[in-house]
Amino acid sequence: MARKLKIDILTLFPEMFDLFNLSMIGRAKKNGIIEINTYNIRDYTIDKHKKTDDYPYGGGAGMVMTPQPIVDSIRSVKESNKGKVIFLGPRGKKFDQEDAKKLADREELIILCGHYEGIDERVYKYIDEEYSLGDFVLTGGEMACIPIVDSICRMIPGVLSKSESYIEESFYSGLLEYPQYTRPEEFEGARVPDVLISGHHENIRKWRRKQALKITKDRRKDLFDKLVMTKEDKKLLNDNEL
């Protein structure tokens, strides 16, 4: 029986995740490979006005998400989901492909999306892991959740059309992806490289590897420096014929 991944998302804006009904993730949901549920944190508040935020103690700009509705939503979801609680916030580890692989190996996940100026510090007692997309400001955790869930789901067997698809993508192998071309062979004077239409599969493989190495070296030196170069890689970088 194929493995299934269940993701429960706690958010103030569940409608933002309707896009998971589209494209490959939508197909995976229909095929029973992935289950994605959204829960509105506002439904768990005991405030008569349905408030989920309040002014910060000590003053300061903005509003802070109150602990009660968040903690109660976590407790409720945990009745049917035993996965770890993942919070998306600025203090978290910068999310990368290795994290996507790790999370894709799990059967259940609970993702908490923050909003406003953040969450009450007392909520962290109920959080297992925290991730950030990078050193920039987003309107809310929902904006980070979408690409993170997408990167996790595409690692699940059966989500992509063929198992090789994600293996050759940028970052999975530690390299940026090689250039891609499609028809026509010539467009406004720019031709597809001859090697790609030669039919020589080994030369095509070498060309793609060389291009990936060059692009990564030029554009992401941080990734290139982490790469364990093979003898072939070193030779390809110095080969002017490919």
Curated annotation (Swiss-Prot):
Sample GO molecular function, one term: tRNA (guanine(37)-N1)-methyltransferase activity
Q: State its Enzyme Commission number(s).
A: 2.1.1.228
GO biological process annotation, one example:
tRNA N1-guanine methylation
Q: Where does the chain cross the membrane?
A: none
Q: Does the keyword Ion transport apply?
A: no
One matching Pfam family, short form? tRNA_m1G_MT
Location in or out of the cell: Cytoplasm
Q: Which residues bind S-adenosyl-L-methionine?
A: G114, L133, G134, D135, F136, V137, L138
- Report the NCBIfam families cross-referenced here: PRK00026.1, trmD
Q: How does it assemble?
A: Homodimer.
Name assigned to this protein? tRNA (guanine-N(1)-)-methyltransferase
Q: Which gene encodes it?
A: trmD
